[in-house]
Amino acid sequence: RDREKAIFVDEVWQLIGASSNRLAAEFVLEIAKIIRGYGGSAVFATQDLNDFFALDDGKYGKGIINNCKTKLVLNLEDEEAQRVKQILHLSETEVMNITHFQRGNGLISTNNNNITVEFKASALEKELITTDRQELLEILERHRQKAAG
């Protein structure tokens, strides 16, 4: 308990969704419930809210949401935005914003306080996290040129 810890679970719907099993889902939910007590934090990410709430009528998805103090919402389709509206008690304006967010924009929700944010990455951060194919090819070419001298 004297060391900070963090766990990151990307595509968490695969562990708590309809195609998962209760044992895996229970484990993820337990992490969400107890990790702060051990000086840790957990980050869960998903792009598919329907699957996130699919197992046992959304029991695990709801449990995770309820145990996460801070939620970050990026661009969503209309249907998913309506679901998030109910869960996070968003206004119509916030829902409209969510459906029109561009890359780098999002909504942070904590303690029922919501704020729209714009994320700015440094050149190094962008290079490390981009998934844009064209940007990756440009980065690869720069590294090849640098290595060639």
Regions picked out by a protein language model, each given a short descriptive name:
Residues R1, T99-G149:
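Conserved P-loop NTPase motor module
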Residues R1-N97, A123:
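Conserved P-loop NTPase motor cores
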